Amino acid sequence: DYSDRPDLVAPLVRILANAAGSERLVGGQMEDLLAEGSTPNADTLKYIHVNKTGALLMACMEMGLFLGDKGGDEEVLILGRRLGMSLGLAFQAMDDLLDATRTTEELGKDAESDAAQGKATSVAFRGIEETRDQAKHHTEEALSFAREIGGDNEFLLELIVYLLNRKK
């Protein structure tokens, strides 16, 4: 409970509000909805992924690091934002891949639901192999940023690798 710690609550609310605002999560969702049923260009697809999944995971990393031992270190927070963005882009690429390549039974939810809804996905735009390469690239970026942050982050490193290798 941080109700008696406005010095912590105010920055956390600011981080989350920035991630959720019209220039981030809300804007990305709007573009995602507008792109349904069409083939988006590279800039639109990037905007959607950066401002939805990327922004959300960027905020999560920044808030977690802010509350940690190195929370006052702006350099660490910058690395955390970069880590979160890379992780978000890797996660989104894997999500698109899994939706396109796994069965309903394997996923535990409807497979190919993105295609059925006419969603703008990396697979629809780039194809399976290039999307897989993007997932690997962004995962390596995230691992690099996590290692640079340092500290007791073995769980984070394992989580990043798990997200690349997940099956659902």
Predicted ranges, named:
Residues 1-168:
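All-alpha prenyltransferase/terpene-synthase fold signal
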